């Protein structure tokens, strides 16, 4: 008898469940979560036999930048680890193109578990885009929580009104050094993942279709997409497990 028959079926099920986005490492973790222990070498072998492979990572897109300036210090200093929720947030804006039209995504990520806690989609990168995103994020704070919010030096974050919104809300502003994308590497990495696992895989006819897919993907990313760093749990699963 084929000793890997049920394991092979599970690998295939997980692969299709996640629309081909998982490579052998995440499939191994997902199998473990279902009580099936396989090493990476075995998972790769089974995937090869099944003729499946993870979708290729496409090179990282450079996010939308404004004029360079000097507004505040880099308080994060590439320390992307947070010991509790709502301690360190990061944000940025990225751009998508569909048939000559543009769509902008502005999210806030919590570095505690990599969860996208708030985001806004807009066809123009206006101040209201980041304001709406910030307002939604603030609703999740208890009165004692005062996160650092880190960004690059994009024009949105240099606006005096953005600084005022943060100050009035008790949020501590932090900014990357000039021209240094590694200072905000985690949110840049999220954009790369989103684009390679969603945007680049489809040919969109209009902005509305893309918008719908991004909303679906962010929900998937938060609720279902497991991470080795989080012990094989998704961001939301990890947060709930730590709070229990």
Predicted segments with their positions:
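Basic, flexible linker segments flanking DNA-binding modules
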Residues: 1-84, 180, 236-242
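RNase H-like two-metal-ion nuclease catalytic core shared by retroviral integrases
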Residues: 2, 65-67, 151-153, 159-162, ...
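Hydrophobic (often cysteine-bearing) scaffold residues that line and stabilize catalytic clefts
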Residues: 3, 7, 23, 39, ...
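Mobile genetic element proteins and their domesticated derivatives, centered on retroelements
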Residues: 11, 27, 43, 47, ...
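C-terminal domain-tail junction helix/linker
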Residues: 167-171, 193-244
């Amino acid at each position: 008898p084929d000793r890997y028959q049920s394991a092979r079926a599970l690998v295939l099920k997980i692969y299709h469940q996640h629309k081909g986005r998982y490579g052998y490492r995440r499939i191994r973790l997902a199998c473990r979560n279902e009580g099936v222990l396989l090493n990476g070498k075995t998972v790769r072998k089974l995937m090869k036999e099944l003729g499946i492979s993870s979708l290729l990572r496409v090179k990282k897109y450079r996010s939308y930048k404004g004029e360079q300036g000097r507004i505040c210090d880099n308080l994060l200093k590439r320390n992307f680890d947070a010991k509790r929720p709502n301690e360190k947030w990061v944000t940025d804006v990225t751009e998508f193109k569909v048939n000559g039209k543009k769509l902008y995504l502005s999210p806030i990520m919590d570095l505690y578990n990599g969860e996208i806690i708030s985001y806004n989609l807009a066809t123009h990168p206006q101040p209201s885009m980041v304001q709406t995103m910030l307002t939604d994020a603030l609703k999740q704070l208890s009165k004692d929580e005062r996160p650092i919010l880190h960004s690059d030096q994009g024009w949105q974050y240099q606006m005096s009104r953005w600084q005022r919104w943060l100050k009035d809300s008790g949020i501590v502003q932090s900014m990357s050094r000039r021209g240094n994308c590694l200072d905000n590497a985690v949110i840049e990495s999220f954009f790369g993942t989103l684009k390679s696992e969603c945007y680049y895989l489809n040919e969109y006819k209009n902005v509305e279709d893309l918008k719908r897919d991004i909303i679906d993907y962010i929900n998937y990313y938060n609720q279902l997409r497991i991470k080795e760093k989080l012990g094989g749990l998704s961001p939301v699963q990890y947060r709930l497990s730590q709070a229990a």
